[in-house]
Regions:
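Short, positively charged and aromatic/hydrophobic N-terminal segments
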Residues: 4-10
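A charge-rich, low-complexity, intrinsically flexible signal that marks solvent-exposed coils, linkers
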Residues: 10-127
Length: 127
């Protein structure tokens, strides 16, 4: 029983890990724009979390890197990322054990907070 659950869990993770970041990026932007936020704000949060800049993010999008490679090659995960807490996709981000999945959910969470109208300073854990 547990072997089957572990296999299902692993397969679900692998599907997300190998998903192209370029295929999800426009969805992040659409989610934000539907709620009156901008592409620039989405990018600001991606830069804040990962250390990418305009040029390196464009390279990631052009190359079609998957999420695993996107985070493996990220210049520097922001140390304040550990302050991101809450539920996203049914999971508490601070309790996710897999480091890569946690990083992906950090990104999902801050984009969700942006779409919900939270101030950038609060999303970036500056206050």
């Amino acid at each position: 029983m547990f072997g089957l659950l572990r296999e299902v869990w692993y397969n679900k993770f692998m599907k997300i890990f190998t998903m192209s970041f370029a295929s999800v990026y426009p969805l992040y932007v659409q989610k934000a724009e539907r709620k009156g936020r901008s592409k620039e704000e989405v990018e600001e949060l991606i830069f804040w979390l990962t250390g990418y800049d305009d040029e390196s993010l464009q390279d990631v999008l052009d190359q079609g890197l998957d999420f695993q490679t996107f985070f493996d090659q990220a210049p520097a995960l922001n140390p304040k990322a550990k302050l991101i807490k809450g539920v996203i996709c049914g999971y508490r981000v601070e309790e996710i054990e897999d480091p890569l999945m946690q990083k992906i959910r950090y990104l999902d969470k801050i984009i969700d907070e942006l779409a919900k109208g939270k101030a950038m300073a609060k999303i970036k854990r500056e206050v």
